[in-house]
Amino acid sequence: MSPNFKLQCHFTLILLTALRGESRYLEVQEAAVYDPFLLFSANLKRNLAEEQPYRRALRCLDMLSLPGQFTFTADQPQLHCAAFFIGEPEEFITIHFDLVSIDCQGGDFLKVFDGWILKGEKFPSSQDHPLPTRERYTDFCESGLTRRSVTSSQNVAMVFFRVHEPGNGFTITIKTDPNLFPCNIISQTPSGRFALVVPYQHQNCSFSIIYPVTIKISDLALGHLHGLQLKKPAAGCGGTGDFVELLGGTGLDTSKMMLLVDLCYPFHGPAQMKISCDNAVVRMVSSGKHMNRVTFEYRQLEPLELETSTRNSIPEYCLSSL
């Protein structure tokens, strides 16, 4: 098993087990029994493309990146369950309730959340999502089948559920639809290239990479100023109305992450930064007065790079270097 794959599985298992309140460190020896990142395989996606709809059982703790139909059936009381769904950056996710057999009066529940939430931290954050937090939940026990489908605002969504009675459960169908201007994204991969475009809309958009990475910005168009200026967090870009931030941290919520640098002025040409945090984010703040765009590449840091970084860094800064 490659070090990169172990790192991916390690992070995912920590994320999922935290739903049970288990904050202790997990040592992952092998991931043969539970292998959520197998579904991120491009080869698997190609092989299944001709066999849609894809069907399989849903686990109590699960992560899925493929459209299809998924059925959960409790074989014993399952009290702390969640399924994380992730699409391509340019996709919305729609969750459709096909069949639900749970006892709402007996304490069961089935809830969809627009985004991901873990240990009180949300993605997108409350600052970046168009809806207040309470409106991001859809509770089946309250709405029933009057609202059979829920569509996310970005490429991630999740389902919380609790089922007491063995044999009870539900079936859902996951579909994806194109998103012409994706705003908040969690990357499926540790490397890639993306252009975050905000066309004359007053909103904040974040691209989250749940890996330590090097980020290279090749183009930044903010529409209101010219030239390049890198300002330290103390100076800030808040007064400009349109700017890009690079953030680092250990959780999902961008509002709780550390501001490493902000970019207030458009430029062409590479600006590179190494961020050894568990989560690195490119975040664009837009006033709505301009067409803003930032194009960047990202690459996961190799283990040797991380080891070298650790020896020469302050831990709370996750080793940021521009």
Curated annotation (Swiss-Prot):
Q: List the disulfide bonds.
A: C60-C81, C104-C141, C183-C205, C237-C264, C277-C318
**Keywords, in A-Z order:** Disulfide bond, Glycoprotein, Secreted, Signal
Question: A GO term (biological process) for this protein?
Answer: cellular response to potassium ion
Its annotated compartments are: Secreted
Signal peptide boundaries: 1-24
Q: Which GO terms describe its cellular component?
A: axon terminus; dendrite; dense core granule; extracellular space; microtubule; multivesicular body; nucleus; perikaryon
Q: Which InterPro entries match?
A: CRF-bd (IPR008435), CRF-BP_C (IPR056178), CRF-BP_N (IPR056177), Sperma_CUB_dom_sf (IPR035914)
Transmembrane ranges, per UniProt, are none
Glycosylation sites noted in the Swiss-Prot or TrEMBL record? N204
Role this protein plays: Binds CRF and inactivates it. May prevent inappropriate pituitary-adrenal stimulation in pregnancy.
Name of the featured protein: Corticotropin-releasing factor-binding protein
Which source organism?
Rattus norvegicus (Rat)
Tell me the classification of the organism that encodes this protein: Eukaryota, Metazoa, Chordata, Craniata, Vertebrata
